[in-house]
Amino acid sequence: MGIKEDNWIRKMAIEEGMIEPFADNQVKVHPETGEKLISYGLSSYGYDLRISREFKVFTNIYNSLVDPKCFTEDALISIVDDVCIIPPNSFALARSVEYFRIPRNVLTVCIGKSTYARCGLIVNVTPFEPEWEGYVTIEISNTTPLPAKIYANEGIAQVLFFEGDSACDVSYADRQGKYQKQQGITVPFV
């Protein structure tokens, strides 16, 4: 199982629709305003995905316990904006701008960008399994004692693509995975 390079990622995105929309290079400056951005787009051995304007920020107003088997929407406040402020020692859920379609013989690993990590913000995304498709639900934890700002439509994490020696026997689509073809921010459910 080897990591895939920029040429392969570009070909799969353009010819197979693996990433939509697809930025064919590292975008570091806003094309219209000239403002510096947290980079996104194609890199040497990965793809830096962007975070959309949709956020769900955790609140403890209605809950005294976080239970992944019984997680309710009232534990989150929905926000649509160009930035999201995450309270100290809290977290937010968001989704990617890009829609992914993962081939049957590929597994991805997603790693948070160092720009945010160096500010005490941890990005967590589980692997995209073979034949999973959808918008990515992203979890961002603010480990600091201060509020933290996240910028929409800018880079948040890098996706690394690993191609297996052969296709798997049972893919995420075959077993009808519960997060298949998710369209928005999807909260946990069992």
Swiss-Prot record:
CDD domains attached to this UniProt entry: trimeric_dUTPase
UniProt cross-references to InterPro entries, sorted A to Z: dCTP_deaminase, dUTPase-like_sf, dUTPase_trimeric
EC number: 3.5.4.13
Catalytic activity: dCTP + H2O + H(+) = dUTP + NH4(+)
Keyword entries, A-Z: Hydrolase, Nucleotide metabolism, Nucleotide-binding
Residue numbers binding dCTP: K113, S114, T115, Y116, A117, R118, Q158, Y172, K181, Q182
A Pfam cross-reference name: DCD
SUPFAM superfamilies documented for this protein: dUTPase-like (SSF51283)
GO MF entries: dCTP deaminase activity; nucleotide binding
Enzyme class, first EC level, given as a word: hydrolase
An annotated GO BP: dUMP biosynthetic process
Domain of life: Bacteria
Active-site positions on this chain: E139
Pathway involvement of the protein, from the record: Pyrimidine metabolism; dUMP biosynthesis; dUMP from dCTP (dUTP route): step 1/2
Its biological purpose: Catalyzes the deamination of dCTP to dUTP.
Similarity comment: family membership: Belongs to the dCTP deaminase family.
HAMAP family: dCTP_deaminase
Subunit structure: Homotrimer.
Name by which UniProt lists this protein: dCTP deaminase
Organism: Chlamydia muridarum (strain MoPn / Nigg)
Lineage, broadest ranks: Bacteria, Pseudomonadati, Chlamydiota, Chlamydiia, Chlamydiales
